[in-house]
Regions:
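Conserved, structured core segments of small domains
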Residues: 1-97
Length: 97
């Protein structure tokens, strides 16, 4: 299942805390990418938050993988996890009237 993930910084997180765990976060994100869990990873252009595309069997599996990230473990960020399905709108082009 393809899963869209939106990062949200928690209000009490400080720049110093992010700096403290930045290398460990990048290393873990790299590991998740190399194992195929994180398929795509971006920063938003309008703010300093990440957008991820994960491939997992379920939302629960995605949340388990995300919980291994140091920023999550140290309560600096949270994620909005959105399961996706294939777009079926093109079927309308071929429907018999």
């Amino acid at each position: 299942m393809k899963i869209l993930v939106l990062e949200h910084e928690l209000p009490n997180a400080t720049a110093e805390q992010f700096q403290q765990f930045a290398v460990a976060e990048a290393r873990k994100a790299w590991d998740l990418h190399q194992t195929g869990i994180i398929r795509e990873l971006y920063f938003r252009a309008d703010q300093n938050e990440a957008i991820l595309v994960l491939e997992r069997a379920s939302v629960n599996e995605a949340q388990e993988a995300l919980s291994t990230l140091p920023f999550v473990q140290n309560k600096l960020i949270t994620f909005e996890v959105i399961p996706l399905k294939a777009y079926s709108g093109f079927e309308r082009l071929f429907a018999k009237d």
